[in-house]
Amino acid sequence: MSFEERITLVTISFRSKSSLEKLIKNVSDDYEIIIVDNSQDFETTKEFSNKPHLKILSPKRNLGFGAACNLGAKASSRDYLFFVNPDCILKEKTIENLYQASQKYKNASAFSPKILDSKGKQTFKRRSVLLSRKDWMSRVPPTEDSEVTVIAGSAFLIEKTKFLSIGGFDENIFLFHEDDDLSIRLRNTIGPLYNIPSAIIIHEGGSSSERSPEIASLKGFHLSLIHI
């Protein structure tokens, strides 16, 4: 069995048809792909319904990011989950390098790639409002495989049994900081998190929930709660 046949890509869509097209064309048909469509977009369902390696889950309402990820994970028939935003471009061997790391660091819980923005600048998640300052990482991103205290939800690989054993994402967190919460629970329960710089993605940003006024307003509201 190839490593591709052991992995399910789980991606959450909210009016993201154009981004999904690019993502799906960029990966092998040997992967299982699960799209959770939080926008009930008929065009998304119509576009991809004829692909045998791809499943589309259409909940009756917008579940939020974490709950949608959990739904996709439970529908997976593979051993590993690669959660990835639809607006991510995967560089060559990104998933393979993450998978190889998972075989090398057996005690670890999850693996994140090096993330670049659309201009090629690296974005490194080194801290969180949910972490104490002592757990904040250096401003200098890792240049080799390294343990980290938090990973970004935009792209990471995890063994399905490990993800489900802690209940997945906290479904009470609708859209923001659910990856920080997951990172903390994984570190405390399963094992360390790793950043793998040889695995590279470009995160174009914004397309998983198209840059609509209602999404911008929702994000502003959630971020404002941090400072209350």
Residues covered by each model-derived region:
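Acidic donor-binding segment of Leloir-type glycosyltransferases
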Residues: 24-61, 71
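Acidic/His-rich active-site region of diverse nucleotide-sugar glycosyltransferases
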Residues: 61, 67-71, 89-90, 97-167, ...
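Catalytic metal- and UDP-sugar-binding loop of GT-A-like glycosyltransferases, i.e.
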Residues: 59, 84-86
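Active-site-adjacent helix/loop segment of glycosyltransferases
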Residues: 183-184, 188-226
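Cell-envelope/extracellular polymer assembly enzymes that use nucleotide-activated donors
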Residues: 6-8, 32, 181
